[in-house]
C-alpha cells in the first residue's frame, strides 16, 4: 500500500518539476509585427534562395528586437517586386512602394512592408540610403514602409551577438518605425552612421518601449 507521505512527496516533486520547466519557457512577446517582404531584381539575381535570405534578415532583426524590447517580427510573405524593372534609387523605390501597396488596400495580413534592394549604390549617396515613410508615433501611427538596400548575401545561422551590417541597418530602420530618431551619440545605433553599433541610446530606447503598443498608421 502506498503511504500518504509518499503520495504527497510525489505530487510535490511533480509540481517542482513543472515550475522549473515553466521558468525556462520564453515569455510571449509584448508586440508581434507582421511583415510583407519584397525583393528587387538585383537581390534575386545574386541568390536563387532569395526567399530564404529575406526571411533570414527579418528573423535576425527579430531576434534583436525580441530580446531588447519584446517585439517579434514575423514574415508573412516574400514576393518579387519590382518584377523586371531596376530602380537604383531608394527615394524612388519608396515612393513606388507606397503607391503600389497603399495601406487602404492592404488585406489585413501584414503590418509593415519591407522592400529589400540589391542595387550597388553607396549608402553615402542619398539614392543608396535606407528609407522609411515616416517616424512613427502614437498620435499619427507607426511607420508602414521600409526600403532597405543590402550590401551582400546574408545567411541566417541563428541568434548571435555579432550582427551583420544589413541586419543592423534593418534594426535601425525598424527603430524609426517605432519612433526612434537620429542622435549625435556615436555609440548609438540611431546615429546616422550606425555601422558596427548595436545598442540604442537611452532616449530612443524609452521611445520604442513607450510606442511598441501603438497602432500603425492608417
Locations of the language-model features?
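The catalytic-center signature of Zn2+-dependent metalloproteases
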Residues: 143-218
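Bacterial N-terminal signal peptides that target proteins for export
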Residues: 2-11
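Acidic/histidine-rich, surface-exposed loop or edge segments in extracytoplasmic proteins
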Residues: 31-48
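Active-site-proximal beta-strand/loop segments in catalytic clefts of secreted hydrolases
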Residues: 38-42, 76-78, 115-120, 180, ...
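Metzincin-family zinc-dependent endopeptidase catalytic domain
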Residues: 51-169
Amino acid at each position: 500500500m502506498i503511504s500518504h507521505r509518499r503520495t504527497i512527496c510525489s505530487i510535490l516533486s511533480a509540481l517542482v518539476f513543472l515550475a522549473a520547466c515553466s521558468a525556462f519557457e520564453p515569455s510571449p512577446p509584448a508586440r508581434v509585427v507582421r511583415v510583407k517582404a519584397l525583393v528587387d531584381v538585383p537581390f534575386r539575381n545574386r541568390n536563387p534562395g532569395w526567399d530564404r535570405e529575406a526571411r533570414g534578415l527579418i528573423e535576425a532583426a527579430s531576434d534583436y528586437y525580441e530580446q531588447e524590447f519584446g517585439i517579434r517580427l514575423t514574415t508573412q510573405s516574400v514576393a518579387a517586386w519590382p518584377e523586371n524593372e531596376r530602380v537604383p534609387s531608394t527615394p524612388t523605390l519608396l515612393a513606388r512602394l507606397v503607391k503600389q501597396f497603399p495601406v487602404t488596400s492592404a488585406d489585413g495580413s501584414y503590418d509593415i512592408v519591407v522592400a529589400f534592394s540589391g542595387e550597388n549604390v553607396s549608402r553615402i549617396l542619398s539614392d543608396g540610403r535606407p528609407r522609411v515613410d515616416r517616424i512613427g508615433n502614437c498620435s499619427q501611427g507607426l511607420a508602414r514602409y521600409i526600403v532597405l538596400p543590402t550590401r551582400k548575401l546574408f545567411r541566417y545561422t541563428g541568434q548571435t551577438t555579432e550582427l551583420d551590417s544589413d541586419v543592423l541597418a534593418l534594426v535601425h530602420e525598424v527603430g524609426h518605425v517605432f519612433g526612434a530618431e537620429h542622435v549625435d551619440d556615436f555609440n548609438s545605433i540611431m546615429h546616422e552612421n550606425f555601422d558596427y553599433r548595436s545598442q540604442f541610446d537611452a532616449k530612443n530606447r524609452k521611445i520604442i518601449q513607450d510606442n511598441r503598443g501603438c497602432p500603425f498608421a492608417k
